[in-house]
């Protein structure tokens, strides 16, 4: 007779309750948004608190062009006289040189690259910090929560079995020279002899 292993199939969901970051600013923000989440009972503050606890790899950066596209979709339906919503990113905001003109955006993020900050303020926008956001919108009213792609890292492209049919994983190649092509699809004329 077999044994019914019911506990094996259950996957333990890992939830972070504290940060591993040594950054004092992030630690203060975690305290602030934990307090706001309890006091205001708003899901926005609870979500910000949850994202602040994440590791750096899970706080992916986002480009200015992506923010501009997302905000354009939201501001189409705005009535005249209403202020545009604040884009909230728990991560870094990076510049995108492919976008020549940037609209006036109000963005709150953990960090802005130097060129991104210059372009936002030059277009008539605002670069806000999370403590300023807590004063302006303590319940998250008139805000739009955005995040970058976590799968944008180079290491993610190698996840999976390379060479398996249907897999798009990149193989780890030790050398990329013409004479030493060691990847799965090397040319036979230049194979290692």
Curated annotation (Swiss-Prot):
Biased composition (Basic residues): 183-193
Subcellular location: Cytoplasm
UniProt keyword list: Cytoplasm, Ribonucleoprotein, Ribosomal protein
One GO MF term: structural constituent of ribosome
Gene3D superfamilies: 3.100.10.10
Region Disordered, residue ranges: 158-193
GO cellular component: cytoplasm; cytosolic large ribosomal subunit; nucleolus; ribosome
GO biological process: translation
Keyword Protein biosynthesis (UniProt): no
Primary location class: cytoplasm
Database matches in PANTHER family: 60S RIBOSOMAL PROTEIN L18, LARGE RIBOSOMAL SUBUNIT PROTEIN EL18
Name of this protein: Large ribosomal subunit protein eL18
Species this protein is from: Trypanosoma brucei brucei (strain 927/4 GUTat10.1)
Gene giving rise to this polypeptide: RPL18-A
């Amino acid at each position: 007779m077999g044994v019914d292993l019911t506990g094996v199939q259950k996957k333990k969901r890992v939830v972070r309750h504290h940060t591993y970051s040594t950054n004092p600013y992030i630690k203060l923000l975690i305290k602030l948004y934990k307090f706001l989440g309890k006091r205001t009972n708003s899901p926005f503050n609870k979500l910000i608190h949850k994202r602040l606890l994440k590791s750096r790899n899970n706080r992916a950066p986002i480009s200015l062009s992506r923010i501009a596209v997302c905000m354009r979709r939201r501001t189409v339906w705005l009535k005249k006289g209403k202020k545009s919503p604040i884009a909230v990113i728990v991560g870094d905001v990076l510049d995108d040189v492919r976008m020549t003109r940037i609209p006036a955006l109000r963005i709150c993020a953990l960090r802005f690259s130097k060129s991104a900050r210059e372009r936002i303020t030059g277009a008539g926008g605002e670069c806000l910090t999370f403590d300023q956001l807590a004063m302006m919108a303590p319940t998250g009213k008139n805000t739009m929560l955005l995040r970058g792609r976590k799968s944008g890292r180079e290491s993610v492209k190698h996840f999976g079995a390379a060479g398996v049919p249907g897999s798009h994983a990149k193989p780890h190649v030790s050398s990329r020279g013409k004479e030493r092509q060691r990847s799965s699809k090397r040319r036979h004329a230049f194979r290692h002899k």
